[in-house]
Design a protein with these regions (language model features):
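PDZ/PDZ-like domain micro-motif
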Residues: 90, 147-148
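Accessory recognition modules or surfaces
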Residues: 93, 104, 117, 151-161
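Conserved acetyl-CoA-binding loop of GNAT-fold acetyltransferases
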Residues: 133-143
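Conserved beta-strand-loop-alpha-helix junction that forms the acyl-donor binding cleft
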Residues: 118-129, 146-147
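Conserved acetyl-CoA-binding loop-helix of GNAT-fold acetyltransferases
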Residues: 92-106, 126-134
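Conserved GNAT acetyl-CoA-binding A-motif
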Residues: 109-121
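GNAT-family acyltransferases
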Residues: 1-89, 153-154, 161-164
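Conserved hydrophobic/aromatic "anchor" residues
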Residues: 4, 106-108, 137
């Protein structure tokens, strides 16, 4: 797991502009390479902007395939929200679970966070729901009719993982 680099622009562009991602997240609109290039160039620390975006790359060839985010960071309560996005061709290979484990280790051990919150649309996002459940996240609540996609509203599940002291 590492910080975003300029060479990650195509990964970011592919994920941010994937309509399947729009269907289950709040992204919902195309993003230009120019805007993403500016975003990568302006990366700040988690404490400066309450968001940290990292990349997970394969060990054998260093090819970046996963983006993980920490956002809504609260240093006092030691919590953050997290997100995870995989390239479509890399789904179903265990990379999501591995990336989530790396992010949790970083959040717990380096940032000393007490808890992580994950949101997942309940329709069309079965893999994410299964990932969070298998990683020990508890469903802490449901936001009714929270996400609009393909002409209808769906619920948003809230998952929380609390780390031991």
């Amino acid at each position: 797991m590492r910080a975003l680099e300029p060479e990650d622009l195509e990964l970011l562009y592919t994920i941010e502009n994937d309509p399947e991602v729009w269907d289950v997240t709040a992204i919902g609109a195309p993003c230009s390479r120019y805007a993403l290039k500016q975003y990568v160039a302006s990366q700040q620390t988690l404490g400066e902007c309450d968001q940290l975006r990292l990349v997970v790359a394969l060990r054998d060839n260093s090819r970046a395939i996963v983006i993980v985010d920490l956002s809504a960071y609260d240093a006092i309560d030691r919590r953050a929200e997290m997100g995870i996005w995989l390239l479509r061709a890399e789904r179903g290979k265990g990379y999501g679970a591995a990336a989530l484990s790396l992010l949790e280790d970083y959040a717990r051990d380096r940032l000393r966070l007490h808890s992580l919150l994950a949101r997942s649309a309940t329709e069309g996002n079965d893999a994410a729901l299964a990932l969070f459940r298998s990683a020990g996240y508890e469903q802490a609540g449901t936001l009714k009719d929270w996400h609009y996609s393909k002409g209808k509203y769906s619920d948003m599940a809230l998952f929380q993982k609390i780390f031991g002291e």
